[in-house]
């Protein structure tokens, strides 16, 4: 009885330790994703996402600070670096200054948008996108209805065939 009790106590201690595991210990502050989109003809929208598994991540860019996700803008003259800081369980802070080529990515996003006539938004674009969206939604709905119809008819056929077999 005694060894079993000791074993149970040890297992409960190990379980409590794994439940208190801090994902911020393994978090890499340089592993962030950046998304770019044209905001105006000169300003570029930037979305920086870092570590959803770690709540104590702070992202700072151009005097804006936010947890895990920061939506900001970039224009010529704004710094091309952002800071990611992670607070450890002991209170220590790891800081990483990440430099990124905002100017090149924003130029590329603007070029692609203008290349395919997606920027600047116009009444014609909005109408075209709305029509395309409605047509795709109708097509997907029709496809779903056909699939459900085929599923029901084949099940009924298979059920009738099984009943007729001796």
UniProtKB/Swiss-Prot annotation:
Q: Where is the signal peptide?
A: 1-19
Q: Name one GO biological process term.
A: symbiont-mediated suppression of host antigen processing and presentation of peptide antigen via MHC class I
Gene3D superfamilies the UniProt entry points to: 2.60.40.3530
Instruction: Specify the superkingdom.
Output: Viruses
Q: Which UniProt keywords apply?
A: Disulfide bond, Early protein, Glycoprotein, Host endoplasmic reticulum, Host membrane, Host-virus interaction, Inhibition of host adaptive immune response by virus, Inhibition of host tapasin by virus, Lectin, Mannose-binding, Membrane, Signal, Transmembrane, Transmembrane helix, Viral immunoevasion
All disulfide bonds of the chain are 32-50, 44-106
The task this protein performs is described as: Binds and retains class I heavy chains in the endoplasmic reticulum during the early period of virus infection, thereby impairing their transport to the cell surface. Also delays the expression of class I alleles that it cannot affect by direct retention. Binds transporters associated with antigen processing (TAP) and acts as a tapasin inhibitor, preventing class I/TAP association. In consequence, infected cells are masked for immune recognition by cytotoxic T-lymphocytes.
This protein is called what?
Early E3 18.5 kDa glycoprotein
Supply the source organism's classification: Viruses, Varidnaviria, Bamfordvirae, Preplasmiviricota, Tectiliviricetes
């Amino acid at each position: 009885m005694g060894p079993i009790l000791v074993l149970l106590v040890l297992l409960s201690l190990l379980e409590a330790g794994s439940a208190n595991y801090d994902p911020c210990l393994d978090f890499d502050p340089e592993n962030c994703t950046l998304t770019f989109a044209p905001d105006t003809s000169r300003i570029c929208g930037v979305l920086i996402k870092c570590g959803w598994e770690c709540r104590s991540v702070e992202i700072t860019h151009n005097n804006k600070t936010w947890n895990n996700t920061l939506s900001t803008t970039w224009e010529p003259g704004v710094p091309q670096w952002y800071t990611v800081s992670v607070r450890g369980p002991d209170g220590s802070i790891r800081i990483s200054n990440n430099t990124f080529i905002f100017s090149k990515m924003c130029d590329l996003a603007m070029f692609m948008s203008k290349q395919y006539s997606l920027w600047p938004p116009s009444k014609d674009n909005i109408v075209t996108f709305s029509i395309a969206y409605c047509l795709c939604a109708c097509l997907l709905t029709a496809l779903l209805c056909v699939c459900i119809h085929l599923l029901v008819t084949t099940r009924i056929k298979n059920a009738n065939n099984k009943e007729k077999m001796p």
